[in-house]
């Protein structure tokens, strides 16, 4: 008898599922550790947690949880428009920014088309491309970042582009002039997805301010998330900003209730709490200095990062990762990103960063 598995398209059967950072509860089960002694620095989450205002909004939203959410996210749409000076028809809301990436793929990628992205790009770009039956083209990196000239050279009449700025997992950043010049050279029929998941961790002078470019580049789609600096990773809220025509097509393939009511309420409150985001930025700056100085003290090189994480080089990275797990420290292996000798560590609280560096030093000493 033919198995149902065989009826699935070959591109679906060939997909390697996305591997998220290991949850604390999973490591506790595997290692027999108490969850309270484990620190997770693997998924680029906000170590401050969530804005108290967003938490209060969640509690209030639970009163009406038996009702379906607003399928058009009216209050959240209004909030985003006011905060970023946008128009309602420019927006698409998603169950995290991963949902925005998938909606873009569903709307604009088909078998016979191509998605171009950088060598060390976020794994989801390749995943959503493969799911549509389109071809993925990985352009070799330049200094762990985007080689924009090579990406331009890869463009054909079948191309769509994915760019992350800052890039994950390398943390590299394209300058505003370089990015804008690149967009000006991209043919207007080529969709450019600009993933700005870590924009809130950039100093003001480093931000692209790409929302202001939409009037000139109607082929640009900017993806944002509330999972990082806003601390709503567990609720899954993201949004895309683009031209009305592109937004309309993406909304046609969007599920009607893809952002739940608790997430919508929390997102509005989080977007309005500038003080919490400022605290998150300041903590990240201090934590980045703490970690990079600590890695340098241990004689380890790292990739200068503009996100809330840093990737560092260490011999036998897979073994070091396992040793960290045994000691209750979760970081992220990035061998799947063509970086087999690197690990990525998220910025945590001061004590968490110190614990990671202490444990890492112990591991390195046992190998000398």
UniProtKB/Swiss-Prot annotation:
Its cofactor is pyridoxal 5'-phosphate. Keywords: Amino-acid biosynthesis, Aminotransferase, Histidine biosynthesis, Pyridoxal phosphate, Transferase. Its EC number is 2.6.1.9. Pathway: Amino-acid biosynthesis; L-histidine biosynthesis; L-histidine from 5-phospho-alpha-D-ribose 1-diphosphate: step 7/9. It catalyses: L-histidinol phosphate + 2-oxoglutarate = 3-(imidazol-4-yl)-2-oxopropyl phosphate + L-glutamate. InterPro entries: Aminotrans_II_pyridoxalP_BS, Aminotransferase_I/II_large, HisP_aminotrans, HistidinolP_aminotransfase, PyrdxlP-dep_Trfase, PyrdxlP-dep_Trfase_major, PyrdxlP-dep_Trfase_small. Disulfide bonds: none annotated. The modification N6-(pyridoxal phosphate)lysine is found at residue 228. Belongs to the class-II pyridoxal-phosphate-dependent aminotransferase family. Histidinol-phosphate aminotransferase subfamily. This is Histidinol-phosphate aminotransferase. The gene is hisC.
